[in-house]
Design a protein with these regions (language model features):
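Short structural boundary motif marking the start of a folded domain
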Residues: 27-31
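N-terminal lobe/hinge region of extracytoplasmic solute-binding protein
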Residues: 34-88, 221
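Active-site-proximal polar cores
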Residues: 562
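Extracellular/luminal re-entrant pore-loop and selectivity-filter region at the outer mouth
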Residues: 568-570
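Bacterial N-terminal signal peptides that target proteins for export
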Residues: 1-7
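Hydrophobic helical h-region of N-terminal Sec-dependent signal peptides
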Residues: 7-16
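Aromatic-residue-lined binding/catalytic grooves and analogous aromatic/hydrophobic interfacial grooves
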Residues: 148, 179, 189, 201-205
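Extracytoplasmic/periplasmic ligand-capture domains
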Residues: 17-24, 68, 84, 92, ...
Length: 601
């Protein structure tokens, strides 16, 4: 053998030896859990559903976010360099960005690193006003009074031309590469809440939107800790750590008496985020398969124990002994949400502000047995809702009582009799005052959990002599129909993204029809009070007007308030650091998984 051949053989042998002795890479840390409803897509301005926003909230980044451990809440900078500079009249907000933040790599950037700059947020906020985007959040941002944006929208609508993103507006502009200025028509003391929703107003890059025109929902590209790797619509979502994510370390501000929060802070402070490598989400709409998937360790987190299985998982509010022996972890919290039955105020049967239709809605509301819904399908995991103001919001009072939670079939029947909803032909069913059939239609979902509610509704309406039919469809189809006004009654929930009552109040605000006002309710007196409440600082004057709005909502009954939900989460022992966000959706980056369990899937 030649010297050269011998040397080559030795080199090959050494290389093989090194390969044989090289340590195996650490197992991938993957958070696995399931959504109970399908996502709709991943373009923030087009989204109105919680589950899609939960994904976008980890891909995109807003200027601010909610501290992970602080309770009830603390707003802290995300991409902003600090808190905003706010004028004394609360109409001018100046915000500086951290330099050196980059979007995830994408072909839309043509091979260059793309830094986040102030103009990206200008573009992001303009998109809410672009008629072509059809943002369900348009009215939420319109009512903030960002000067010039609504006029730019009107110009596009009247000219039938594309929205002009290049025209500067007074209300949102870049003063320099890293400084954003907002100017508002009226004082907005709580404007920072609108800047703290990564799932809604996280920065998007114009190049990405233009590169994937018409397919924006499929191509989310942000600056956040995760990026979309795989998506099978309504089935499976996989996200992976963004390799270009800047250095962000674990820091939070738990209350002094928060033992768990203090323990998480002591354990993780200074760790680089995210601490896990990937997130895999399955869409499992039926409760039993979702529960079994978790027990079979196909998921390591059960984000919301299905109500059907709370007696098995947490009997009497305590972790079941068989789960405790296996070191499972459980958390329980009252959600900042409200669950209600919307009435379509434009529907000829249940809509309208005339006395007869108001009486019909109030009678239906009095005839709905909320206590049965709580004790039955919900297995005690809810409390009756009195108003649209959710727990932990300004204006929420646990002792405040309205007619909304009353169950009084006798009074309901009396109201129906008084306003001419009578059984004229003796068949046991009421007719409308003009003699035409009275038939209600409830939109629902085709699974065992929702069918329990259908049975309660059918029984309750039969007790009143009212026919009820049910139309079942998947969640995204129902939401699409409801947003288009193609429904009569729909039962659904809404989780707060901020600690203000405004989100609940907006659900009956006339200008938000087509957005959050799914009931399509329009009452000038209510709208005038809403405008006042928006401009006032928190305090007695604002609370007094808020209460007047709630009285009007109770009187006209555009929705039947049902419950505020109690949420229960369950995790395998390898998951550490979890806490359900009180507001916002971000938690993936703050959790960790122990290596053995991360590899056990």
């Amino acid at each position: 053998m030649s010297l050269r051949a011998a040397a080559l053989a030795l080199l090959i042998g050494l290389t093989a030896c090194q390969r044989a002795t090289a340590p195996a890479p650490p197992p991938e840390k993957v958070l696995r859990y399931a959504f109970p409803a399908a996502e709709t897509g991943f373009d923030p301005p087009q989204l109105a559903d919680l589950y899609s926003r939960m994904v976008t909230g980890h891909i995109f980044e807003a200027l601010y976010r909610y501290d992970y451990l602080a309770r009830p809440f603390l707003v802290v900078p995300d991409t902003a360099a600090g808190l905003p500079e706010v004028s004394t009249d609360q109409r001018t907000w100046t915000i500086r960005l951290q330099p050196g933040i980059y979007f995830a790599d994408d072909p839309a950037f043509k091979g260059r690193k793309r830094e986040l700059v102030a103009e990206d947020y200008v573009y992001t906020f303009k998109r809410f006003f672009d008629p072509a985007v059809k943002s369900p959040l348009f009215n939420s941002y319109r009512q903030e009074g960002i000067l010039g944006l609504e006029a730019l929208r009107e110009r596009a609508l009247k000219s039938h031309r594309a929205f002009d993103y290049d025209t500067p507006v007074e209300g949102v502009r870049a003063l320099d590469r890293y400084t954003i200025l907002f100017r508002l028509a009226e004082p907005r003391p709580r404007f920072i809440f609108q800047l703290a929703s990564s799932g809604a107003c996280g920065a998007v890059a114009r190049e990405v939107i233009e590169a994937y025109r018409g397919h924006e929902m499929e191509h989310p590209v942000g600056t956040g800790p995760f990026m979309l790797e795989q998506w099978r619509r309504s089935s499976f979502i996989r996200l992976v750590r963004n390799p270009g994510y800047r250095t962000v370390t674990y820091d939070a501000h738990p209350n002094a008496d928060d033992a768990e929060g203090q323990a998480w802070l002591a354990r993780f402070k200074g760790r680089r985020l995210p601490m896990i490598d990937a997130v895999e989400i399955s869409i499992i709409e039926e409760n039993q398969p979702r529960w079994l998937s978790f027990l079979n360790h196909e998921a390591n987190l059960l984000y919301g124990i299905p109500e059907d299985f709370t007696p098995q998982a947490i009997p009497h509010g305590r972790l079941a002994p068989n789960l405790a022996r296996r070191h499972f972890q459980a958390w329980r919290a009252l959600a900042s949400d409200r669950y209600m039955a919307y009435f379509n105020m434009k529907d000829p049967v249940v809509g309208g502000l005339d006395p007869a239709h108001v009486a019909l809605r109030r009678a239906i509301s009095l005839g709905v047995d909320v206590a049965r819904q709580i004790s039955g399908p919900r297995h005690g995991q809810a409390i009756p809702a009195q108003t649209v103001v959710a727990p932990f919001n300004f204006g929420y009072d646990p002792d405040f009582k309205t007619e909304a939670s009353d169950f009084d079939p006798a009074r309901a029947n009396a109201l129906l009799d008084l306003y001419g909803y009578l059984d004229r032909d003796g068949d046991g069913w009421r007719e409308q005052p003009d003699g035409s059939p009275l038939v209600l239609e409830l939109r629902s979902q085709p699974d065992s959990f929702y069918r329990q509610f259908e049975e309660i509704w059918l029984r309750d309406m039969t007790r009143l002599g009212i026919r009820l039919t049910v139309r079942e469809a998947q969640w995204p189809e129902n939401l699409k129909a409801v947003r288009a006004g193609q429904y009569m009654i729909w039962q659904a929930g809404y989780t707060n993204a901020s600690p203000d009552a405004q989100i609940g109040l907006e659900q009956m605000y006339g200008p938000s029809i087509g957005g959050l006002n799914l009931a399509r309710f329009k009452l000038p007196a209510y709208d005038a009070l809403y405008d006042e409440v928006e401009a006032l600082p928190d305090g007695p004057e604002r609370l007094e007007r808020l209460r007047r709005m709630l009285q009007l909502a109770t009187a006209y009954a555009p929705m039947k308030l049902l419950v505020h939900r109690v949420v229960n989460d369950l995790a395998w022992p390898e998951l550490t650091g979890f806490r359900r966000p009180a507001f916002g959706v971000q938690f993936w980056e703050y959790i960790d998984l122990t290596a053995p369990a991360a590899a056990a899937h």
